[in-house]
Amino acid sequence: MILLVDIGNSRIKWARLDGGKPADMGAVTRGKTGIKRVLSKAWKEFGDVNRVVVANVGGPKVAEQLEQWLQTHWQIAPEFLTARSNGYGIRNAYSKPETLGIDRWLGLVAVRQRYRGGDRKKAICIVDCGTAITLDVLAADGKHLGGLIIPGLAMMPKFLADHTAGINETTEAVEYSLLASTTSAAINAGALYGAVAFIDRVSHDVAVEMKGELKFVITGGDAPRILPLLRDKYEHLPDLVLRGLARVAKDTSKVRRETDLDCAAQ
C-alpha cells in the first residue's frame, strides 16, 4: 500500500493511493508534544504499507519524528516531496522553485490534472485556507503566475494577542457576527471578514487582468467558514493537496517499477 501524507501546521491528513486517486482519507490534529503518539493511535490498523509519500509544511522537527516512527513501526523511509521548476504541465513562477511551499505546488498539480478540455482555456485561482491563507493563480497554458500569503483565521487573533496590549488570546468558542459585542468576537469576525475581503479583492483584480476567464477553487480547514461569504463561485476541494500527492506518487511509482524491471533484466 502507498500512503499519502499531508502534514500541515495544525493537522495531519492522509489517504491511500487507489487507482491514481486518494481513498480512505483521514485526519488528526497534531499533538503539542509531537506526532508519534498521534500516529500510533491513528495508523495502528494499517498494514502492508511499502511507501509513504509526504507533503510537509510543518517543519523539520515533525519530519524527523515521522522518519523515526516509520522506521520503528514499518521499517521504511518517507519520501518528502519538494516543488519543481516545471512538471505535470506546470511552470513554477519562483526563481528558486524549491522554496514554493509543497502544499501550494501540489495544489497546482491537482487542478492542472482536474481541469481538462474546455476548462483548460481558463486560468485558475486557488485559495488554501489553512493556518496561513494562500492564493495562487495558474494560467491556462500551465504557467504559475505567482501568489500571495496572509495569516489564517486562527493566526490573526494570536498575532493580536502577542502584539497588542489589552487583548489576550481567548479559549472561548469561536463566534462570528457582522458587528460583535465582545472583544473576542470582534477579533474573530475581523479575521473572517479580513480574509474574505482579501480573497475577493485579489481574485477580482486577477479576473480583470485575465479578462474574466478565471475559475475558482478553494481548499483548507477554514474553507467552510470563508466560502459562504465569497462573491465568486468556488469549487470546494477539501482533499486538494492529497490529490496532488496522488498524481505525483502515481508518476513516481511508474518510474520505480521501470527501474526495478531494468535492474532485474541486467
UniProtKB/Swiss-Prot annotation:
Active site: residue positions: D103
Any Pfam family matching the protein: Pan_kinase
Catalyzed reactions per annotation: (R)-pantothenate + ATP = (R)-4'-phosphopantothenate + ADP + H(+)
Residues that coordinate or bind K(+): D128
A GO MF label: ATP binding
EC number(s) on file: 2.7.1.33
Cofactor or coenzyme needed: NH4(+); K(+)
Enzyme class: transferase
Entry annotated with the keyword ATP-binding: yes
Keywords annotated in UniProt: ATP-binding, Coenzyme A biosynthesis, Cytoplasm, Kinase, Metal-binding, Nucleotide-binding, Potassium, Transferase
Keyword Chloroplast annotated: no
Binding partners and assembly: Homodimer.
Full protein name: Type III pantothenate kinase
Name of the encoding gene: coaX
